[in-house]
Structure formats: C-alpha cells, structure tokens
Amino acid sequence: IHSSGTSIRFEDVFTADHDSFLESMADADRSVMDYMGRENIVYINVANRLSVDCDCDAHPHDPEMGDIGIFASVDPVALDQACVDAVYASEDDGKAALIERIESRNGIHTVEAAHSLGLGSRRYELRCIDSHKN
C-alpha cells in the first residue's frame, strides 16, 4: 500500500507520491470487498482519543481530541465521511490539530478515491443509538 503497488522492496515503501498512497488504501478496500463480498462486511470506526498520527505509527503523537463516538456502517465511504465531518463539527479545541493534518496531507483524498471507485457514497444519515445522548 505505501508504495502504491510500484515495489515490494522495503527500501521503496515510502517513495510513492502521497495521493497515490491514499488511492492505494481505497484500492485495498476494494480488494477486500471483492474477496469477502460487500454484503458480508460491516465497518466500525472507534473515534476515541484522536491523534494526528496513524495508528500504524510506533510512536504516535499524544491524542489531540477526546472521544467523538463509535460509528458503524455497511458503507465504508459514508462511514469515513461521517467521521471526518464529526471532527470538523466537534466542539473539542483539539480538533484544530486534526483538521490541519487532514488538510495538509489531503487526508480526504482516500474518501474521494473510494467514492470514485464506486465503493460507497459520501452521503449518510447519522442515527444515535446511545440512550444517554437522546
């Protein structure tokens, strides 16, 4: 994924341009969907203690934001769009760091690429099932 399919050599892992890397994540999702069958997958995002760094980072930056919820969908594009929108809509002051990281790294591009591949819709409807929030 990190080399956008251009190499399997470790030395080349981080040589792809950033947008190609983001597009390869959408391609990887498509591969899983094709293999497993879209009807057999439910996606869950746990948006708690949000850091600007990827969860794959061995030494991530401390969390900038608190919990904004657990999101689930059978549509991975709608799910990720809802999570990004929740960051922007949050009243948490720490959101500024996440928004800066999203915008400076074109982070929404994976959602755009997945939508372009037909993996889902960027439109969604949120339904709160937490009785404490109603």
What function would you assign to each model-found segment?
Residues 1-134:
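Extended, low-polarity segments enriched in aliphatic/aromatic residues
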